[in-house]
A protein has these predicted regions:
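N-terminal subdomain of nucleotide-sugar transferases
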Residues: 2-65, 253-255
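A short helix/loop element that forms part of the nucleotide-sugar donor recognition site in Leloir-type
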Residues: 12, 210-224
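Conserved donor-binding/catalytic core segment of Leloir-type glycosyltransferases
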Residues: 25-27, 181, 225-241, 247-250
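Acidic donor-binding loop of glycosyltransferase active sites
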Residues: 301-318, 331
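Nucleotide-activated donor-binding/catalytic signature segment of Leloir-type glycosyltransferases, i.e.
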Residues: 266, 274-300
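Membrane-proximal helix-turn-helix segments that form the acceptor-binding/catalytic region
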Residues: 44, 103-110, 125, 132-133, ...
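Conserved acidic donor-binding segment of nucleotide-sugar-dependent glycosyltransferases
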Residues: 347-358, 366-372
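Donor nucleotide-sugar binding/catalytic pocket of nucleotide-sugar-dependent glycosyltransferases
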Residues: 60, 75-76, 159-213
Length: 407
């Protein structure tokens, strides 16, 4: 557990509380910090809160890089457990670490006086269960629909467990005071609880100009010729991301536009595509680069060398945070035509295609052949991101949300 400065205690409602109030208690069942979806989103939230002067205590897993922000204290649960990495998605390790959050959470609410609790994902469940003891308002950060995320799991995808998960989700949505969800999930939330106070996250995209030497070095490092077209995917390789669909599409693209290189960044399991015929053929042709997860700062350089950015994601109700980065990069985007993608994309900012390799491949070929059309799409996406997805509007949204939490 993270060490923190001891403060004098007094009594309120029969519980000991600190004489010094911390505004917000954040409970995050995540490895914080790591360069992947939800931890990146959480860091954005914490940075915005810090900039606006909020004091925040974060209860989280023992896994992750240290983060220092003004007003932030981190309390790591389960540090004594022999767990040093947490895979994406459901795992026994994550369940064990979820339970380890409970005693640290209880100690926090007995040691400090908070104005409200901000709980991510499944942490909202035990925060609500224990409400009779803390009586604090809850903002539920619904990064995804848990039943949808686990639909492909061999056990939790079974109908009996899906019904149970949907019951838990429905209960949390209806009991939370406010809900903030990933872009594209609002409609799902309102279908469960029509009167819910729900807001969607629209995260800021970042853009950095790179010197020619930096991009040339990356191309050389990846073994990509200067005149080769580059199609880039970033993110995890879980089944719902549609990476297999992209690999199938890539075969069509390489046949139509020889020399095209597909770069997939975020691979954590080198053997994941060992049985993929498409991956094997692309490797034989020298058209595929599988790259391990990269620091966020380096991802921008990967986007700088790309000619097309792709998101072949299934319709699971929420948008991948990479879309905001894609839009900030100003490169043409090909994405599956799902409600979550349409939360920020339309035909003026991307090519949206059905969930077939043929449609995705055709759109990529079109952009590789018509660079002027690609530039128009990329410029439009970047312009939209600059106007609507900037850091200031995001930080203002955090301030508004937290002001509501204080009421």
């Amino acid at each position: 557990m993270g060490a923190a400065e001891e403060t004098p205690l007094t009594m309120e409602h029969g519980l000991p509380v600190s004489l010094h109030s911390r505004a917000i208690l954040v409970v995050a069942p995540q490895p914080f910090y790591e360069n992947r979806g939800t931890p990146i989103a959480l860091r954005n939230v914490l940075e915005a809160a810090s900039q606006r002067g909020y004091e925040v205590d974060l209860v989280t897993f023992p896994v992750g890089e240290p983060v220092k922000l003004p007003g932030l204290r981190i309390f790591r649960a389960g540090a004594w457990l022999p767990i040093r990495n947490v895979p994406i998605g459901f795992s026994i390790r994550k369940v064990i670490l979820d339970f380890s959050l409970l005693p640290v959470f209880l100690k926090r609410i007995r040691s400090e006086k908070y104005e409200f609790i901000y709980a991510l994902e499944e942490a909202a469940f035990f925060v609500l269960l224990l409400r009779r003891w803390h009586k604090l308002p809850l903002i539920y950060d619904m990064q995804s629909s848990l039943p949808e995320q686990l639909k492909a799991h061999p056990v939790l995808g079974l109908s009996v467990f899906q019904r149970l998960l949907r019951s838990f989700e429905r209960w949390m949505v209806r009991k939370a005071d406010r809900i903030v969800c990933s872009a594209g999930l609002r409609k799902h939330v309102l279908s469960i609880a029509p009167s819910a106070d729900v807001r969607e996250w629209f995260f800021p995209g970042t853009r950095r100009e790179f010197l020619a030497g930096e991009t040339d070095h990356l191309r050389k490092e990846l073994g990509i010729d200067p005149d080769s077209g580059v199609v880039l995917y970033t993110g995890n390789f879980e089944p719902y991301q549609g990476v297999e669909r992209l690999l199938d599409a890539a075969l069509n693209v390489v046949a139509e536009v020889p020399g095209t290189i597909f770069v997939l960044v975020g691979d954590e399991t080198p053997s994941r595509f060992s049985r993929s015929k498409s991956a094997a053929l692309l490797r034989e042709q020298g058209s595929l680069r599988l790259v391990p997860r990269q620091p966020k700062s380096k991802i921008n350089c990967f986007m700088a060398i790309a000619d097309v950015l792709v998101s072949p994601r299934d319709d699971i109700g929420n948008i991948g945070i990479k879309i905001f980065e894609y839009m900030g990069a100003g490169k043409p985007i090909v994405a599956t035509d799902t409600p979550s993608h349409r939360a920020v994309l339309d035909e003026t900012r991307a090519i949206l295609v059905d969930l077939s390799p043929e449609a995705m491949g055709s759109a990529i070929v079109r952009l590789l052949r018509d660079r002027a059309a690609g530039k128009r799409l990329g410029d439009s996406a970047r312009s939209y991101a600059g106007k609507h997805l900037g850091w200031k509007s995001f930080a203002d949204g955090i301030a508004d949300l937290y002001a509501l939490g204080r009421k």
